[in-house]
Curated annotation (Swiss-Prot):
It is found in: Cytoplasm. It is an enzyme of class 1 (oxidoreductase). Keywords: Cytoplasm, Metal-binding, NAD, Oxidoreductase, Zinc. The lineage of its organism: Eukaryota, Fungi, Dikarya, Ascomycota, Saccharomycotina. InterPro entries: ADH-like_C, ADH-like_N, ADH_Zn_CS, GroES-like_sf, NAD(P)-bd_dom_sf, PKS_ER. Its EC number is 1.1.1.1. The gene is ADH1. Homotetramer. This is Alcohol dehydrogenase 1.
Length: 348
C-alpha cells in the first residue's frame, strides 16, 4: 500500500495552547507496531482534559490527541504477526503495555505502570496515520461502519467495563449520571443489552427525550429536581442497585453515594478535575455500599464490547465533522452542549 510521507493532524505544543491543524510527518511503525490509516476518530472528554493539562499526569509535548481511531492497516512492524494489510483496526486509549508485570499477567493491562496511552503519552488518532501496539490494537470486522465504530473504542469499552464492575444482575436498576453525553448514551444501550433497567440523569427536556429513545425507563432532570436523591429512590423502588458516574460532576458523585440502595455499588468513571469522593461514612457502612473506580477495559473487555456493537445491539448516536473543526467541538464540550458523540473525519 502506498503511504504518504506527510499528513494532516491537529497538534498542540503546550497544554491549553493553540490547537494547530497542520501537516506533520507520517510516523514509522516500530517492530511491534502497526500503522493505521485513521478514517474516523471519536472525541472524548479525556482529549479535552489532555489538551488542558487537567490531570496529575504529564502528557507528551507536542501532542496529537485522540484515542478512538478506526481505520485500515497500511503498515506492519517487522516483529508483528497476525495482522495483514487491509485489516480494519482500532486505536484504543491503551496503546501498549509491558505484558510482564503483575497487572498485565492478571489481565489488568490498563493498570500497568509502563502503559502507553494514545493521545496522551503516544500520539493519537487526531491524525490521518497513527501507530498502535499490535497486541493492544482492536480488531474490527471487515465491512464495519468505521465512523460508528470509533466511539466504541473508548466510550463503549469504558462503560461496558464499568457495568461489569458494578456486578449486578439482569433486572436490577442502574442509574447513569451524565446519561445524555457520549459515554452515557452508550452506557444506556449496553445496560439494556445486558438486561438491566436504566434510570438516567441529565439536564433539559431534549436530553430527557434522547435518553428515553435509547432505552432509559426513567429520567431525572437535575436542573428542575428539588430532591434528586428522593426522586431517584422513588423511581427505582428504593434506589438503584448500582450507579455509574460518567458525568464530570463532583456533586453527582456525592449524590450517588446517597441514593444507591443498600448493598449497592457506586462506580466512578468520569474524572472531574480535582474532584474528591464525599460520602457519609455512617450511611456507607450501615447500607454496606461499595465505591469502586473503573478505568478502561482489557483486551477481553474490548472484544466483548465490540461484539455487542457488531451484532447490532449498540447504535452510536454520532455527529461527524471534519478533523479541522476539532477546536469547535472542544468549545461545545466545555459548554456542556454535546448530545451523543462527536466523530471527526480525518479527510476534512
Amino acid at each position: 500500500m502506498s503511504v504518504p510521507t506527510t499528513q494532516k493532524a491537529v497538534v498542540f505544543e503546550s497544554n491549553g495552547g493553540p490547537l494547530l491543524y497542520k501537516d506533520i510527518p507520517v510516523p514509522t511503525p516500530k517492530p511491534n507496531e502497526i500503522l493505521i490509516n485513521v478514517k474516523y476518530s471519536g472525541v472524548c472528554h479525556t482529549d479535552l482534559h489532555a489538551w488542558k493539562g487537567d490531570w496529575p499526569l504529564d502528557t507528551k509535548l507536542p501532542l496529537v490527541g485522540g484515542h478512538e481511531g478506526a481505520g485500515v492497516v497500511v503498515g506492519i512492524g517487522s516483529n508483528v504477526t497476525g495482522w495483514e494489510l487491509g485489516d480494519y483496526a482500532g486505536i484504543k486509549w491503551l496503546n501498549g503495555s509491558c505484558l510482564n508485570c503483575e497487572f498485565c499477567q492478571h489481565s489488568d493491562e490498563p493498570n500497568c505502570a509502563k502503559a502507553d496511552l494514545s493521545g496522551y503519552t503516544h500520539d493519537g488518532s487526531f491524525q490521518q496515520y497513527a501507530t498502535a501496539d499490535a497486541v493492544q490494537a482492536a480488531r474490527l470486522p471487515k465491512g464495519t461502519d468505521l465512523a460508528q465504530a470509533a466511539p466504541i473504542l473508548c466510550a463503549g469499552i469504558t462503560v461496558y467495563k464499568a457495568l461489569k464492575t458494578a456486578q449486578i444482575q439482569p433486572g436490577n436498576w442502574v442509574c447513569i449520571s451524565g446519561a445524555g453525553g457520549g459515554l452515557g448514551s452508550l452506557a444506556i444501550q449496553y445496560a439494556k443489552a445486558m438486561g438491566f433497567r436504566v434510570i438516567a440523569i441529565d439536564g433539559g427536556e431534549e436530553k430527557g427525550e434522547f435518553v428515553k429513545s435509547l432505552g432509559a425507563e426513567a429520567y431525572v432532570d437535575f436542573t428542575v429536581s428539588k430532591d434528586i436523591v428522593k426522586d431517584i429512590q422513588t423511581a427505582t423502588d428504593g434506589g438503584p442497585h448500582a450507579a455509574i458516574n460518567v458525568s464530570v460532576s463532583e456533586k453527582a458523585i456525592a449524590q450517588s453515594c446517597q441514593y444507591v440502595r443498600s448493598t449497592g455499588t457506586v462506580v466512578l468513571v468520569g474524572l472531574p478535575a480535582g474532584a474528591k469522593v464525599v460520602a457519609p461514612v455512617f450511611d456507607a457502612v450501615v447500607k454496606s455500599i461499595s465505591i469502586r473506580g473503573s478505568y478502561v477495559g482489557n483486551r477481553a473487555d474490548s472484544a466483548e464490547a465490540i461484539d455487542f456493537f457488531t451484532r447490532g445491539l449498540i447504535k452510536c448516536p454520532i455527529k461527524v465533522v471534519g478533523l479541522s473543526e476539532l477546536p469547535k467541538v472542544y468549545e461545545l464540550m466545555e459548554a456542556g452542549k454535546v448530545i451523543g458523540r462527536y466523530v471527526v473525519d480525518t479527510s476534512k
